[in-house]
A protein has these predicted regions:
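Bulky hydrophobic segments
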Residues: 1-120, 126-127, 133-158
Length: 158
């Protein structure tokens, strides 16, 4: 019986996620954003309270929902890629998981955009690729910040 280790689990999850991304880009028309009527009410409510500034971080998601979706989806992909490479027995891959995650994720994004050229009513977009890269980059930064904080906290205990 084969014993699954951390690498095999993350590799499987990463491959399933890549297939999910491929499936999404194979659809001729993606599901539209949900009804945002309640958000307009929330914005007006926060304006009345003088707290409209709380909405500013979400402006990008409101203005460019498709690019925001790319960022979020590829951030998940970047997290999985990093964990897969970090748990690899290959010393180079595990030591340089961040740049390799960016490289592999970006190459996957390029092939995904190329694939969309052949999907009816879809097209390749350099802006989508930029959003994919930003998601991958945010994931790596999140991981670096997490482990940096973890290291500082562990040093503070000693």
């Amino acid at each position: 019986m084969v014993k699954l280790n951390k690498f095999h689990v993350f590799m499987s999850l990463t491959c399933v996620y890549a297939v999910f991304l491929f499936y999404l880009s194979s659809l001729s028309s993606l599901p539209g954003p949900p009804e945002l009527g309640f958000l307009y009410g929330l914005v007006h409510f926060l304006e009345d309270l003088g707290l409209k500034f709380l909405i500013y971080p979400f402006y990008f998601a409101y203005r460019y929902p498709d690019k925001f979706a790319h960022v979020i989806l590829y951030m998940g992909f970047g997290l999985l890629l990093n964990q897969t490479l970090s748990s690899s027995k290959n010393g180079v891959l595990s030591e340089y998981a961040v740049p390799f995650s960016l490289l592999i994720g970006t190459l996957y994004g390029v092939t995904d955009e190329f694939h969309q050229v052949f999907v009816p009513y879809r097209s390749a977009s350099s802006m989508d690729l930029c959003a994919d890269f930003m998601g991958l980059l945010f994931a790596q930064l999140l991981i670096l910040v997490y482990f940096g904080i973890k290291r500082v906290l562990s040093e503070g205990r000693h």
